[in-house]
Curated annotation (Swiss-Prot):
Protein's name according to its UniProt entry: Photosystem II D2 protein
Domain of life (superkingdom): Eukaryota
Entries under InterPro entries matching the protein: D1/D2 (IPR055266), Photo_II_D1/D2_sf (IPR036854), Photo_RC_L/M (IPR000484), Photo_RC_L/M_CS (IPR055265), PSII_PsbD/D2 (IPR005868)
Binding site for chlorophyll a ChlzD2: H116
Gene behind the chain: psbD
Organism: Phaeodactylum tricornutum (strain CCAP 1055/1)
Matches recorded under CDD domains: Photosystem-II_D2
HAMAP family: PSII_PsbD_D2
Key words, A-Z: Chlorophyll, Chloroplast, Chromophore, Electron transport, Iron, Magnesium, Membrane, Metal-binding, Oxidoreductase, Photosynthesis, Photosystem II, Plastid, Thylakoid, Transmembrane, Transmembrane helix, Transport
């Protein structure tokens, strides 16, 4: 008879750390948490600090904090001054030289929030990968979350990198984002950009699919319990489905003439539409960073210039964009001291 005696393998420091990080607790930490939690905490903390106390007087000539009288919709952490270029604006860098007050004044909090926010989003994506692997499911949640990451990185980092400085990035605030949207329209004609059109179709299409799917499932729930409502009839361990896919298919076949007959294809489509919309929007913003133009219908512009009675919605929008540029530039970039004489301001029956 042979007796095999096993020896306990000596566990290294990596194994001990791995065990602690993946320990079953109320809030899972994991290796991704080492990136997610510090960066997300600092990004949110930096934004709350900036919107509460820090002025934008030295960067945009604006009041932007609760301390100065702003509210939740008008407060913001504003982008750095144009003169700062694409500097990382480190607290210990040559611009601030360790002076926290000066660092806040020149816009250091914006780069702080933008960079930590980017890494926080990446950490959250990695968290979904990590937990999916531990639970034993596919990582489509993490893949879907690549869409918001792509939009954030393209808007807040890649667009200003293609422009003159961080100054042209959106500031972190509600009204500040609206100002940025007007800027994109006036200077890039963003709404006529095909990538923006695909993005709108993806986001609104995803919302439509979500509403239809939720309503259809609610409509076809099996009432297989004796409780007061159908929610209690569901148990997490039940073997049968909770709603009738066959009935749902029958319903939409009668409505449209076609319907999803496969749950996998249905849910993949619900994943694909909004994520593709986010990615196409991100690609479009990278195009704006390089100053790529949207659709130009020059023949309509030439005819409108020759014939005062000819006008289209396109030529209307071109005039409106000229107005946005002329009246916004002086307000938006006070450091340039723009002065536009009356004869260069846009004219026409569109305005």
């Amino acid at each position: 008879m042979t007796i095999a005696i096993g020896q306990n393998q000596e566990r290294g420091i990596f194994d001990l750390i791995d065990d602690w990080l993946k320990k079953d607790r109320f809030v899972f930490v994991g290796w991704s948490g080492l990136l997610l939690f510090p960066t997300a905490y600092l990004a949110v903390g930096g934004w709350m600090t900036g919107t509460t106390f820090v002025t934008s007087w030295y960067t945009h000539g604006l009041a932007s904090s609760y301390l100065e009288g702003c509210n939740f919709l008008t407060a913001a952490v504003s982008s750095p001054a144009n003169s700062m270029g694409h500097s990382l604006l480190l607290l210990w860098g040559p611009e601030a030289q360790g002076d926290f007050t000066r660092w806040c004044q020149i816009g250091g909090l914006w780069t702080f929030v933008a960079l930590h926010g980017s890494f926080g989003l990446i950490g959250f994506c990695l968290r979904q990968f990590e937990i999916a692997r531990l639970v034993g499911i596919r990582p489509y949640n993490a893949i879907a979350f690549s869409g918001p990451i792509a939009v954030f990185v393209s808007v807040f980092l890649l667009y200003p990198l293609g422009q003159a400085s961080w100054f042209f990035a959106p500031s972190f605030g509600v009204a500040a984002i609206f100002r940025f949207l007007l800027f994109l329209q006036g200077f890039h004609n963003w709404t006529l950009n095909p990538f923006h059109m695909m993005g709108v179709a993806g986001i609104l299409g995803g919302a439509l699919l979500c509403a239809i799917h939720g309503a259809t499932v609610e409509n076809t729930l099996f009432e297989d319990g004796d409780a007061a409502n159908t929610f209690r009839a569901f148990t997490p361990t039940q073997s049968e489905e909770t709603y009738s896919m066959v009935t749902a298919n029958r319903f939409w076949s009668q409505i449209f003439g076609v319907a999803f007959s496969n749950k996998r294809w249905l849910h993949f489509f619900m994943l694909f539409v909004p994520v593709t919309g986010l990615w196409t929007s991100a690609i479009g913003i990278v195009g704006l960073a390089l100053n790529l133009r949207a659709y130009d219908f020059v023949s309509q512009e030439l005819r409108a210039a020759e014939d005062p009675e000819f006008e289209t919605f396109y030529t209307k929008n071109i005039l409106l964009n000229e107005g946005i540029r002329a009246w916004m530039a002086a307000q938006d970039q006070p450091h340039e001291n723009f002065v536009f004489p009356e004869e260069v301001l846009p004219r026409g029956n569109a305005l």
